[in-house]
């Protein structure tokens, strides 16, 4: 019979994939598998090691006791990472600047470029060093941090003394100083900025000061714009905001707040925030008495809860996306549906921790995994699915409606069943019983010996 194969349960099994074109080999229960699809190859010894290669996008991923140690490569870019703390990376940027980074977080940082030495830096934290294009800053220089450091972001330079207690800032029409939390002042003049479309925009100025932060604050924002804003605070006595688009007043913060948002067209009362909130208007309708109940919605969002966190519901509707998520006690139960309002197609995921996870993709493919202690908390995490999910997947079931294929596996193929329009295969108890049917050709095996065989001609 064409296509005859032997199955040995969780000792060894080789089969076609159900949800996509390709083949998979599993052996030693959950501790080895390899998989080949049209573009991607996977090889793994869960949970110790896994390797994925996708030649079509020049991508490779190595995991060693994930997430203990990982290596990612995308084209010429590569990165080693150890528990998100120690990392080494390098490769060729789109600007053709060959750069290599080394990090032993948080003590050592370095970068070397083969083509532009201006990109080089070295830092030995907290003693001395310079960083470039790190931590959302163009440049960071420090000496015996926190005694002294200097940061630059675009045209704004900040000199810090005994960070975060003292600083002097200047640049881009702005200057100021702070001795935190005692006193501070900063102001900026109105400036012009050219956006990405070549249009000149006005960047508003401001005047800000504080003393005994955050008890006493004074801010005038948006100077020179169509929405100048005045904010004053003497906490906990009062805070207020006044602007053409919004008025807000708080008395005995955070107990009593009234808000009139003319831009978004709603009024809101908070008594106190965030526990008791009522809002009414075209832009927002909210009724919340936390943790008893809460209902909130506007044109695109809906959020409800009852006896939080026992039941929560959240919906986002913005064509062509409609996303709904229902949760019971955080991740104990979760049902997420993402639907295209244009085509009507949808994908869905249902998790019940730690018992199962089930998902359906936009093509209608379905997959059920029984026992899932990590997947509900970190859904769609390839590292978890590749290195840890095989260890506790006691039952797997997959269905492909387009091809008509389906498969079920119990205890790492101790029992396995595959069906397709012209194919059926059943294997039980290490393959001691096997049945296979391809078209009209049938075969039955006991103890790996053929005991019955028929062909279509018969």
Where are these regions (language model features)?
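Outer-membrane beta-barrel proteins and related beta-barrel translocases across Gram-negative bacteria
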Residues: 2-458
């Amino acid at each position: 019979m064409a296509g005859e194969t032997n199955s040995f349960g969780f000792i060894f099994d080789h089969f076609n994939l159900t949800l996509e074109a390709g083949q998979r080999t599993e052996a030693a229960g959950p501790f080895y598998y390899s998989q080949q699809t049209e573009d991607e190859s996977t090889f793994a010894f869960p949970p110790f090691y896994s390797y994925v290669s996708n030649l079509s996008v020049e991508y490779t991923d190595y995991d060693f006791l994930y997430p203990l140690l990982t290596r990612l490569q995308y084209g010429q870019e590569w990165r080693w990472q150890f528990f998100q703390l120690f990392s080494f990376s390098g490769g060729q940027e789109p600007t053709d600047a060959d750069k290599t980074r080394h990090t032993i977080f948080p003590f050592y940082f370095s970068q070397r470029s083969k083509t532009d030495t201006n990109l080089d830096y070295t830092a030995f934290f907290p003693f001395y060093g310079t960083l470039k294009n790190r931590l959302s800053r163009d440049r960071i220089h420090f000496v015996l941090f926190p005694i002294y450091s200097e940061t630059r972001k675009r045209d704004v330079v900040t000199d810090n003394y005994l960070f975060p207690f003292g600083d002097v800032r200047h640049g881009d029409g702005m200057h100021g100083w702070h001795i935190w939390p005692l006193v501070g002042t900063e102001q900026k003049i109105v400036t012009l900025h050219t956006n990405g479309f070549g249009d000149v925009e006005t960047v508003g100025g401001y005047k800000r000061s504080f003393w005994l932060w955050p008890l006493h604050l004074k801010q005038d924002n948006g100077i020179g714009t169509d929405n100048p804003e005045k904010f004053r605070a003497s906490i906990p006595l009062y805070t207020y905001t006044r602007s053409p688009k919004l008025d807000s007043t708080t008395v005995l913060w955070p107990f009593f707040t009234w808000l009139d948002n003319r831009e978004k067209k709603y009024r809101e009362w908070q008594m106190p925030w965030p526990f008791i909130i009522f809002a009414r208007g075209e832009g927002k309708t909210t009724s919340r008495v936390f943790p008893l109940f809460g209902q909130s919605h506007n044109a695109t969002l809906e959020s409800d809860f009852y006896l939080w966190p026992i039941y929560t519901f959240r919906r986002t509707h913005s064509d062509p996306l409609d996303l709904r998520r229902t949760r019971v006690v955080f991740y104990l139960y979760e049902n997420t549906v993402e639907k295209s309002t244009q085509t009507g197609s949808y994908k869905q995921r249902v998790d019940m921790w730690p018992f199962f996870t089930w998902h359906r993709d936009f093509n209608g493919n379905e997959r059920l995994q029984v026992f899932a202690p990590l997947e509900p908390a970190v859904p769609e995490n390839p590292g978890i699915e590749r290195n840890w999910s095989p260890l506790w997947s006691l039952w797997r079931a997959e269905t492909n409606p387009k091809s008509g294929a389906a498969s079920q596996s119990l205890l790492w193929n101790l029992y396995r069943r595959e069906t397709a329009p012209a194919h059926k295969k059943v294997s039980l108890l290490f393959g001691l019983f096997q049945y296979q049917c391809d078209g009209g050709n049938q075969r039955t095996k006991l103890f790996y010996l053929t005991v019955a065989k028929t062909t279509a001609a018969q």
